[in-house]
Design a protein with these regions (language model features):
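A cross-family phosphate/adenosyl-ligand binding-site feature
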Residues: 1-195
């Protein structure tokens, strides 16, 4: 169906998900799983370093991770729909977000589809959630996070919620994914304090 036919029709909301090379591929996978249980259409891009980290940290194949998304984009495809502000989305989550990616986004460098899509998300005033995964943090990291927060991004440290009663590492990482989904304003089942 062409875009012309869809104009004015009700579309599914879209969310862009990026997985970069920081340790913690499980955060991106749990995010995709959480979003799959909603009505949003997910657009996934995995950086080359993200693919390497996935292969080192997990037993998930590239195909298994990509199958969790509705649409998968190549990280070098700078003409992808998600690289344009005219392609409407609810927002974008980078999970995990390496400090390299965070630095590129903070400085406006758009050398990959991940940083370009994040740049578009910011310029269009859409929600950008960065699941930062680094420890300890240098002053440069903190300044980049400050610049991004001032530009409208949300820095969501990869700090699990232990009070939710998770029994394993994957479930703990799921608490961070649930927070990212909530920050996007997507209606989904997740643990809420006091509920």
């Amino acid at each position: 169906m062409s875009e012309t036919v869809l104009r004015g029709a009700r579309r599914r909301e879209r969310v862009v998900v990026a997985i970069t090379g920081a340790s913690g591929t499980v955060y991106g996978v749990r995010l995709l799983q959480a979003l799959a249980a909603t009505t949003v259409e997910t657009h996934l891009v995995i950086s080359p370093s993200g693919q390497l980290t996935r292969s080192l940290e997990t037993d998930w194949s590239k195909e298994e991770v990509e199958s969790l998304a509705d649409v998968v984009w190549k990280p070098s495809d700078m003409a992808a729909a998600i690289s344009s502000g005219s392609f409407r989305t609810r927002g974008m989550v980078v999970a995990p977000c390496s400090m390299r990616t965070l630095g590129e986004i903070a400085s406006g460098v758009t050398s990959s589809l991940v940083s370009r899509a994040a740049d578009v998300t910011l310029k269009e005033r859409r929600r950008l959630v960065l699941v930062a995964r680094e420890s300890p943090l240098s002053l440069i990291h903190l300044r980049n996070m400050t610049a991004l927060t001032e530009a409208g991004a949300v820095i969501l440290p990869a700090c699990p919620s232990f009070y939710a009663g998770a029994q394993d590492v994957e479930a703990l990482c799921g608490t961070v994914a649930d927070r990212a989904v909530a920050l996007l304003g997507v209606d989904a089942e997740h643990y809420e304090w006091g509920e």
